[in-house]
Amino acid sequence: MGERGELVSDLHPSDDHDADPRLAPLLAWRQQLVDSGAVAPRSFKEAHLRLVLRSGRTDVEQIRAMLPGSVAEHAEEMARILAELTPAAPEPDPPPVPEPQPEPEPGPGKHRSPETDEPPVATTTEIPIPTTGFAPFQFSSQQVALHDITVQRTDAAVELSWPPYEAPEDEAAQDISVVMYRVVSSDDQAPYSPDPAHLVALTEEPKATDERQQVSPVRHYQVWVNVGASEAAARKTQPVLYATAVLVRPVTGFEIREDAGWVIGQWTAPPGVTAVHVFRVPIDEVDRDEAQYRILTAGENLAGFVDTEPVRGQRYRYRARCAVNVDGVVRLSEAAEADVELAAALMPVTDLVVETAADGASCDLSWTPPAGGQVAIYRSQNGPSADAEAIELPQGALEQVGLTPELRVTQDLTEETGSDGRRRARLTGVTWPSEWSRAYFTPVTLMGERAMLGRTLSSVRTGTIRDIELAEYCNKQVLTFDWPDGAASVIVYLAPKGHDPRSGLNGRSFEISLEEYERYGGMHLTGQLPVGGCSLHLAPVAFAGGRRVVGAFSSIEYRGLLRLQYAVRIGRDPNGFPTTATIALRAEQNVPGSPGFVLVNNPQRLPLSVHDGHPVDVAPLDARGQLADHPSKELRWSALTTSGDGELWAANLSGLQGWIRLFVNIGSPAQLRVIALLDPPVETLRLTAATL
């Protein structure tokens, strides 16, 4: 066959078929389809009509196979028109049958056309198409390629390669010593067979080179395989579509540049390209699927793009691929690409977060790392100068704003990815000198010899509340304590007795500032505490960076106070001397039963205690005002009520003078501290008329 691995020239003739009388009616029919919108002019060209006429095909399926996919539905109508335009011809007499002669074997690599004494006459029968020595393609069912052609564009040509041919199982027993690859191409539309297409190469190697310049937006490549026991046998067999590829023409004049943090791209897209896909790929991810990095999807980008969203300090690979719709599938060209490294900008940290530990002894810091440079954290007692934030200055000038080298935090930082997918830098367990009640943390972005201060935040460490005391003043309580260091105020929560503040506090609360505490000498609680007692939980409150910080809790128990009030009515004889006294008692709240009481008489003064005088005989009265029991030295009500109009007690005052007073008769000091017995007006307790 000669040098089959080399390219061979296109042997297809360019016969003029304008003289075919069927062309004009077919052109008029095509124009009707175009005008009605049934087909697009680009999809159904005059070349397709000429191709059908030149082939001589009149069968519907054969015509359908020669038309583009979007026009194939009109094949039956075209076959009908051809049948109407073809005149019927009388059948000629059969020619004499010549003596059979052995067919000479054609020379390897040569094409031989049959010799005739007269030029061929166009008829309605099939017209052979020059096929570079191969049997004409016979239309059958649609063929589907088994493989893809690998296409690589170089400066001078397009390199094509494909997998070597392997015979299917049904041909394994046949002799296929010769495998011939027919590499063909067609612009815009895929060829229906190898015959009308441009022959790129005829080779026995699974590769070829196309040195032609591509001028159309799309070029279709096909590899057809002819196999046989010999070259002659292979040429006589029907070709099989083996591999295909679609090559989209790339952009030209590709240029990329950075402009003040934006990236600008310029190019020229070939005519016929509908859009250019632009990709911005991080340089360390160039081997990953680029689809996720496509940008500017809303525009066609035919002349270029402007990317306003790259991250400063990062390096990207920008790619541009021409996009063309081929039979409903978007095909992309090879990429024109260039790397761009954006100059990093010195950016301050503005989202520093300070999380103080529960004990107030340490805190955790976190922030979003800027695109360029590194971040140093400075810890100070007073913070930097107020006008230094977000201002670029030399690193040597940090001391002038109050950030000296010894204030820099030297702990190792870690990076983590948050729930939103963004990176966060973190410093954990950061402490500060114990004598500081407040610490300021300032993030500083460093790049080269430049520095920029970010937003400063503070953390507060309040002292523990100690020496808590609750003084009872019968009608109010006064809470006192040592004021905690660093606290702006103290908050007090009320909770049930024995409540653990770690379980949460959501009851009533009271808050007092340092100024109020010093003015009133403590926190005064008038009628605020429950009679039955409660627990009080105190915590220091400070403010850091506009945030309210609550310190550790300290607690005290309030046992409560039962307030009782009694009234005395003294009965006298005609001479004004006391004879009896009636005693009534009411409580702040209803209580079943009561403690014991003693009515004490002191002839000299108002009794000061249960032992400061002599107990008076007393007895309960019934509903009629008569003694209901024998006299005794102790009063005990069956119930203490808020009305006090229930039981009455009577006292025998005959022969007594001076003063009387009622006392609670309980031996336990702890129990006495939860009962307050309020005296009536002192004049009602005096027995004699003598003045004090």
UniProtKB/Swiss-Prot annotation:
It comes from the Bacteria. Disruption phenotype: Loss of DNA conjugation when disrupted in recipient strain (MKD8), no effect when disrupted in donor strain (mc(2)155). The recipient strain does not secrete EsxB. Disruption of the probable saeA-saeB-saeC operon completely blocks polar localization of EccCb1. Transmembrane segments: none annotated. The keyword Cytoplasm applies. Residues 1-23, 87-134 are annotated as: Disordered. The keyword Isomerase does not apply. Its main location: cytoplasm. Keywords: Cytoplasm. GO terms for cellular component: cytoplasm. Residues 89-107 have a biased composition (Pro residues). Residues 1-21 have a biased composition (Basic and acidic residues). It is found in: Cytoplasm. DNA conjugation in M.smegmatis is unidirectional with distinct donor and recipient strains; mc(2)155 is a donor strain while MKD8 is a recipient strain. Mutations in a donor strain that alter DNA transfer do not always alter DNA transfer in a recipient strain. May be involved in assembly of the ESX-1 / type VII specialized secretion system (T7SS), which exports several proteins including EsxA and EsxB. Involved in DNA conjugation in recipient (MKD8) but not donor (mc(2)155) strain. This is Putative ESX-1 scaffolding and assembly protein SaeA. It comes from Mycolicibacterium smegmatis (strain ATCC 700084 / mc(2)155) (Mycobacterium smegmatis).
